[in-house]
Regions:
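Short, structured segments at the rim of ligand-binding sites
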Residues: 1-281
Length: 281
């Protein structure tokens, strides 16, 4: 496919937000450079509302002229220009959650610097889930620290819509909780890099874990995963989540681990640095 750039006209567009917020952010970012204002109407709902809000706030910081309200049903971007700014980037909360979950799972302790609970990244709310499961969390002015427990607590139902990238993380540690955990409101992740609901249910079943699959989520029951070979389906979040199980069960093998390069190329080396025994075949 070849695309030849030309001046953007602007105008009105109607867009769905129920599959991914990324389509909306991708449309908004170039909109200040259109000839006339761009009006984006969301015809249903946004599954990860906070990411669009984060996009808009950064656009404003760099000089864009935008109008929106908190429900983000209508967003207007007026012709304007970005101006250079110096900013300090914080750590990626989505990636940090795998390491927080690792500490939770192994009764360990970890501190993530350059990330606070006050971040606007929605996946930071995974900290609340881990706290609900019994972990001790310290919310510092420049860090998050988590200390695990010997037995994780389950027995709850949770909507993961706003932090849906952590659905697989929670599903991977759920077998080690004392009671079942139900995850809901994440039907949209069936349309991400893989059908993530189907894939994690398939993987947990291969591990010998009882799981119930729903249209918009799943329920994971406590169990003792057995060693097996698991397929990542070329999905970085599948690989990163399933690797956590290997911290508790010897003999977990993962096909195509290189798919983590999309998010965290050094993921397995970082796990090794934290004490996990990883063999690269």
């Amino acid at each position: 496919m070849s695309i030849k750039g030309k001046e953007l006209a602007g105008g009105n567009v109607s867009l769905s937000g129920k599959i991914s917020s990324q389509f909306i952010s991708g449309l908004l970012i170039p909109s200040p450079y259109t000839k006339k204002s761009v009006t984006v109407n969301i015809k249903d709902y946004i599954v990860q509302h906070s990411y669009v809000l984060l996009t808009l706030q950064l656009m404003e910081k760099f000089g864009a002229n935008v109008e929106y309200d908190n429900n983000l049903k209508k967003i207007v971007v007026h012709p304007s220009h970005y101006t250079p700014q110096d900013i300090e980037l914080e750590a990626d909360a989505s990636t940090a959650c795998y390491f927080l979950a690792l500490a939770a799972l192994t009764n360990g302790k970890i501190r993530i610097d350059n990330l606070t609970y006050e971040t606007k990244q929605p996946d930071i709310k995974m900290v609340d889930v881990l706290e609900q499961m019994g972990c001790k969390v310290t919310k510092g002015s420049s860090f998050i620290e988590l200390e695990g427990v010997s037995q994780l607590k389950g027995g709850f139902e949770i909507s993961m819509r706003e932090m849906s990238d952590q659905t697989l993380t929670l599903a991977a540690i759920a077998p080690f909780a004392d009671r079942g955990i139900t995850i809901k409101d994440v039907e949209h992740i069936r349309h991400h890099e893989s059908d993530r609901i189907s894939v994690i249910c398939e993987s947990l079943t291969q591990l010998g874990i009882r799981v119930e699959e729903f249209k918009d989520g799943l329920k994971v029951f406590p169990g003792n995963p057995k060693p097996t070979l698991l397929n990542t389906h070329d999905d970085h979040r599948v690989a990163m989540s399933l690797a956590l199980i290997g911290s508790k069960v010897e003999g977990i093998q993962i096909n195509d681990p290189g798919c983590v390069s999309k998010t965290c190329p050094q993921y397995f080396r970082l796990l090794e640095s934290l004490g996990l025994n990883i063999s690269h075949l």
